[in-house]
């Protein structure tokens, strides 16, 4: 009897091909043109994006990308490649017939490329794993959109399963707890920083915030932290309309006034370190905190390719392996 072959799609946001302004502009154009990300009327948004935002922003952040770039490419891409390799080993050790592809919602390797490869290798089922523990209409939903679009090229739609979120997955919570325990000092305040979304999106039905809160609550409960020992904030706001609050940078400006002078920050919504964690949180926000009276600040890395994270993702997928 022929054993079934499962295709696994590891989906993440994406990254520029190089840290050059041209490549960054090309990537940002694809990303910020998605109505799931910015839902303003096209006639209003696209001229603003193409005429002002892309020329200015791509040049401005090229230096930031250059500072974190590695020989393997962007950190997000390099780490996702490691996750793929380690997950392949995970399934080989369990004698599972699995093919894993990486598909980015924006940029390369594209979702289309990943799907075409899986179907060409005649997989019997595809499991789509968006590498976002907390669901958002700005991240998880675009994965579904692009995945569905990629299937349009094929006459036969392979049976598939789409993992919606895993914000309370036991292995995910335990991986966060272990990572924090080995890095958090007794006298440090713990800040959970999640990527923000416009407040309006929440009002329109995006339930991202409750999932972020549930993740943080589950972690602090296992850590035994009191309410005055931690806080949840939202980072990376963009544009002029209100986003989810409290804002990470604004909290850091006032933390010392509240008696918080030693701080560690973790970003549980990121499955791999990237520009927002390595530059914004680790470097830029550290400067803010210290400038406003903070004494010590350090960033707790994303789960990345840690053994606990690979076990978390592997077991999450293993549960869905049967057709």
Curated annotation (Swiss-Prot):
GO terms for molecular function: ferrochelatase activity; metal ion binding. GO terms for cellular component: cytoplasm. Keywords: Cytoplasm, Heme biosynthesis, Iron, Lyase, Metal-binding, Porphyrin biosynthesis. Its EC number is 4.98.1.1. It is found in: Cytoplasm. It catalyses: heme b + 2 H(+) = protoporphyrin IX + Fe(2+). InterPro entries: Ferrochelatase (IPR001015), Ferrochelatase_AS (IPR019772), Ferrochelatase_C (IPR033644), Ferrochelatase_N (IPR033659). GO terms for biological process: heme biosynthetic process. Pfam families: Ferrochelatase. Pathway: Porphyrin-containing compound metabolism; protoheme biosynthesis; protoheme from protoporphyrin-IX: step 1/1. Its main location: cytoplasm. Fe cation binds at residues 195, 276. It comes from the Bacteria. PANTHER family: FERROCHELATASE, FERROCHELATASE, MITOCHONDRIAL. Catalyzes the ferrous insertion into protoporphyrin IX. Belongs to the ferrochelatase family. NCBIfam families: hemH. This is Ferrochelatase. It comes from Mannheimia succiniciproducens (strain KCTC 0769BP / MBEL55E). The lineage of its organism: Bacteria, Pseudomonadati, Pseudomonadota, Gammaproteobacteria, Pasteurellales.
